[in-house]
């Protein structure tokens, strides 16, 4: 039996202007998982964000972030169907239907609704 790998899940902040910031809080911060499992990652915004501006990224050590999902639910080019995104308002989700060995990475949500 393969030992579970660590899937890291971090917090990303955007500072939209001098008066208000949108804080994106992701949970859980880490997961111990095995290949084949279903994974659900959550992202909550401190204020409502248009779905059109919500993106998810995957990052592996030593590599640039890879765009997975844009517009909250649209897969980027060449992203496998096991990745799906959903949500609106303040609550968004990234789901990996069956975790593959190559999916062990850091995942970020980002909002582009309000930028600095």
UniProtKB/Swiss-Prot annotation:
Q: Which UniProt keywords apply?
A: Adaptive immunity, Cell membrane, Disulfide bond, Immunity, Immunoglobulin, Immunoglobulin domain, Membrane, Secreted, Signal
Work out whether the entry's keyword set contains rRNA-binding.
no
Q: Describe the location of the Ig-like domain by residue ranges.
A: 22-116
Output a single Gene Ontology CC term carried by this record. Answer: plasma membrane
PROSITE patterns attached to this UniProt entry: IG_LIKE
Task: Please give the chief subcellular localization of this protein.
Answer: secreted
Location in the cell reads: Secreted; Cell membrane
Which region ranges are annotated with the description Framework-3? 78-109
Matching InterPro entries, A to Z? Ig-like_dom, Ig-like_dom_sf, Ig-like_fold, Ig_sub, Ig_V-set, IgV_Light_Chain
Where are the residues of the annotated region Framework-1?
Answer: 21-43
Source organism superkingdom:
Eukaryota
Can you list the disulfide-bonded cysteine pairs?
43-109
Task: Specify the signal sequence span.
Answer: 1-21
Provide the residue span(s) of the region labelled Complementarity-determining-3.
Answer: 110-116
Q: What does this protein do?
A: Probable non-functional open reading frame (ORF) of V region of the variable domain of immunoglobulin light chains. Non-functional ORF generally cannot participate in the synthesis of a productive immunoglobulin chain due to altered V-(D)-J or switch recombination and/or splicing site (at mRNA level) and/or conserved amino acid change (protein level). Immunoglobulins, also known as antibodies, are membrane-bound or secreted glycoproteins produced by B lymphocytes.
Which PANTHER family does this entry report, sorted A to Z? Answer: IMMUNOGLOBULIN LIGHT CHAIN
Q: What is the name listed in the Swiss-Prot or TrEMBL entry for this protein? A: Probable non-functional immunoglobulin kappa variable 3-7
Q: Which organism is it from?
A: Homo sapiens (Human)
């Amino acid at each position: 039996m393969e030992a579970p790998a660590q899937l890291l899940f971090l917090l990303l902040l955007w500072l939209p202007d001098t008066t208000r910031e949108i804080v994106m809080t992701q949970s859980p911060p880490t997961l111990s998982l095995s290949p084949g499992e279903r994974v659900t990652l959550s992202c909550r915004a401190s204020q409502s964000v248009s779905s059109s501006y919500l993106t998810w990224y995957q990052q592996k050590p030593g590599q640039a972030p890879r765009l997975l999902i844009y517009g909250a639910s649209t897969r980027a080019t060449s992203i496998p169907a096991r990745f799906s995104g959903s949500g609106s308002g303040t609550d968004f989700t990234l789901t990996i239907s069956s975790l593959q060995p190559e999916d062990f990475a850091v995942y970020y949500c980002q909002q582009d609704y309000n930028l600095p």
